[in-house]
């Protein structure tokens, strides 16, 4: 009985299992058929849309249903990637291969930490894509309503040669996805050849639109008006060229400019009748000797300090600080959201730009001191080379005796074999943090000032020959890299008027010229040192020694021919020294430079005003004679009081450092609105005033401030042969900057630099002076239009907000 019951139970179980298996097979077969029909319908819709975009004639007839077995006989739609073949030349066809069209924006979790994407990350689709996409919504623009809207809008159409606007066909970033039978739905990146077929300048992207309150509160309106006045004050002081460089010289062929065959050629120019004289620390220029009214007036010191105090009162106003703090946070979050929805598109656009990547886009070292422009290993090799090849060269006069190079090292009890990088001791270490005095001592190789005088000075017994040879080697390294440029700071101290001629003679006689290099003049703010030494008697003497030779050579180039040639390569004036030194805030009624005879150093703002006022007048005079102009680009905001940044806001085109902007949301927001260039040096700051992880550079970048990376002092800071790339690489690694971020920073550095209009046209595009995506050429900058359009749109919205929608945004950048 038991055996019969067991047999019946086994038969029943077998029949039940068979029925279940048959049912499962049937349901599986039916599901596959439905999926295949849905895939074929998507495929037909996709081909139909492609035909509408690519063909001139529209075909409105629906495709008839096709059997699954006949799908391989369909004509190949235009624009599809080439057929991949196997080893024997047979096409590889996956029976389950389909192309699924997803929405433009998917609410997926980003694969890299917000706000950035790793520079080395590949693009992958999320594994948790929505499998149930409605057919009528598969290509619709996405609208995410979360305190605003996000819409997918194409970039404006291309303009034809006749000025007509041509519509640009939408090339949505559809990534090919193959169902290869993997149970986990593994997806593959697009084939490189397919990516390169895309036109990167035609990509669509998701725009961020946050609808603000229609009517701001009275407090906000008042704050906006105050900020608007601050911007107007800056515009009142700024020197702008009457004719923009792109209007003087129209570039039709942005090919590689021919190098200057004779950069030191002196062309005779006629002396003009201009007359100038120093009045209360500012040079007044008259059309002739008999004229009574000056022709290039500039705001006086009382007006400047009054306006600066107004800026300082604005910085301290609580309601304005609140408004600016909120706007800055909103700018940062907008960029984070932009990366969440557009980072993949930006990277694909970069991949679609042939030849360009971070390594071969132009990048300018916008802040580097000439005396420290080489790395420590380079300096060590050079010293050993000279000690081996020229030991008997007389190089210095000390204690009434002329010494050869060999005798100098014997007096130090050193040989060439003894020298190493550690003994050279020029690299900054922990002992230099908050010790600017110790940092300056690092300019002395082996701790010996005589070695600095021999190798790192141009006004020495050998007339700076060693430094000139070392400089040429650095120039050679830059030219070999091709894509790296530098703006070297070289010092004029103001102790005597002949310094300018000595400097120009050293440059011209040693033929120090490179297409990759321009010069800035740095003025150390050490009046108190010269006054205590008795070299000068008043601050007026310092100004006379610095500016009178410049006006003389401008009026009559024949009076200083070498200086005239040298000034053609000078693009900026810098103020340098330790900003952390305590100082008294200047008042509205300060003593004139002639009255400043005490031994105390004037405040930073005092230096800035008198350098600005004389430089403004000089530029007006030089522009009237068709000569190059010089911009004020001081060190500012590395340490010290916020007054420094307020004074620079009114007077300076760009500044170096600016880390103290993090202490003032109002001033930071004003620097953003004015797009004042910040040449920041995080590694240098890390050795002196602020740890790397606390540096505000990444925050400034997210918020849209005009920031670039620079090296400052490669001799003391960096370890490699390419210090600028080292600066970028460390920033990219620690702050997770993407390739797009790095290229945007490099593009900013070219804008901030003082290189010529012709070179900038070749480096970043011939329309670089236009705002927005019209001024961007991804084939030159490797920065996608998506990023440039986002930055411009957000900045434009902020400007319209500050001006209460009553502002005319210029189509070109500031001159």
From Swiss-Prot:
Compartments in which it is found: Membrane
Main location: membrane
One Pfam short name: AMP_deaminase
Stretches for region Disordered: 53-116, 144-173
UniProt-listed InterPro entries: A/AMP_deam_AS, AMPD, Metal_Hydrolase
GO cellular component assignments: cytosol; membrane
Protein name listed in UniProt: Probable AMP deaminase
Protein source organism: Oryza sativa subsp. japonica
